[in-house]
Design a protein with these regions (language model features):
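Active-site entrance/lid segments in N-terminal catalytic domains of soluble metabolic enzymes
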Residues: 1-158, 186-188
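Alpha/beta catalytic cores of nucleotide-metabolism and tRNA/nucleoside-modifying enzymes
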Residues: 112-116, 134-161, 165-275
Length: 275
């Protein structure tokens, strides 16, 4: 099923708490739907984390670009114990190889809750990390390597493909490479219902872009490894249409591959490389 991640690019804690409250107030089945809401936090957001736990948030994404930082695992352990087990799931990342996954597995064993990790660095459709840092790997390569590690080590970690998903075909490929979940921010940015800054012709969206840093107020100035993108309003679709197209594309892709279910298809895609 679909889950939603709430971002942290509002100017104040109060603004972010209002966003969470608005989402919770519009739930038709809170007991079930609250388990599908993730909230993004930074390494300095201890006060904010306590506030969102008080609101009923259970799932935390530690939102840093570099999941290899030693602070990330320590921070995850710290907030879990401070939460008195109110945190039910934690998502780490981002990573581009399997070198850190053993440490993530140790964290799972220590905390005893599901640990997810985002796989993908420099592959996002509004990511400029490659241009700024010179670093990138192919997204399929990253996913496949990490998925192989999870499988061969009988790991309990959950792999989340993050970056480069422009259409349903991209999501299908991510699942085929071994992802169990896929981040879909770029795809759902085309929804009429999504949050954007709107002018007469375009609506803008982006990641850690200069535009977003300016509009988000209070974000420290630094170099940008993201960029904003214009979306012509004539190209926007309803959320229902986007979800229908997504599931239809994935279902057909699974069928073409000779598998009956998405679960069977995950990690069993066959890729032909053209050189």
């Amino acid at each position: 099923g679909l889950s939603v991640c709430l971002h942290r690019f509002n100017s104040t804690i109060q603004d972010r708490l209002k966003l969470i409250n608005d989402v919770f107030m519009n739930m038709t089945d809170p007991n079930t739907q609250i388990k599908r809401v993730w909230v993004s936090v930074g390494l300095k957001d201890l006060e904010y984390i306590e506030a969102i736990l008080h609101q009923g948030v259970e799932n935390i994404i530690i939102d840093v670009a570099n999941g290899y930082m030693t602070d990330v695992i320590g921070f995850a352990s710290k907030i879990f114990h401070k939460s008195e087990k109110r945190i039910k799931k934690i998502m780490l990342g981002n990573v581009h190889s399997d070198t850190i996954l053993q440490d993530y597995q140790h964290l799972y064993t220590y905390l005893g809750i599901p640990i997810y990790f985002r796989c993908g660095i420099a592959s996002g459709s509004v990511c400029n990390t490659r241009g700024m840092t010179g670093y990138n790997r192919g997204q399929i390569t990253e996913i496949n390597e990490c998925a192989d590690w999870v499988d061969s080590n009988h790991s309990n970690l959950m792999l989340v493909a993050d970056g480069g998903i422009a259409n349903p075909a991209c999501a299908t490929k991510a699942f085929g490479a071994g992802a169990e979940y896929v981040m879909m921010g770029g795809y759902f940015a085309h929804a009429k219902e999504s949050q954007h800054v709107i002018d007469e012709i375009y609506k803008f969206w982006g990641g850690a872009s200069e535009f977003q840093q300016i509009m988000s107020k209070g974000i420290a100035e630094r170099h940008s490894e993201g960029k904003e993108r214009d979306i012509n309003k004539d190209d926007l679709l309803s959320l229902d249409k986007l979800v229908s197209d997504l599931w239809g594309g994935i279902s057909s892709g699974v069928s073409y591959s000779g598998h009956k279910t998405l679960t069977d298809f995950i990690g069993n895609g066959v890729f032909e490389l053209k050189v």
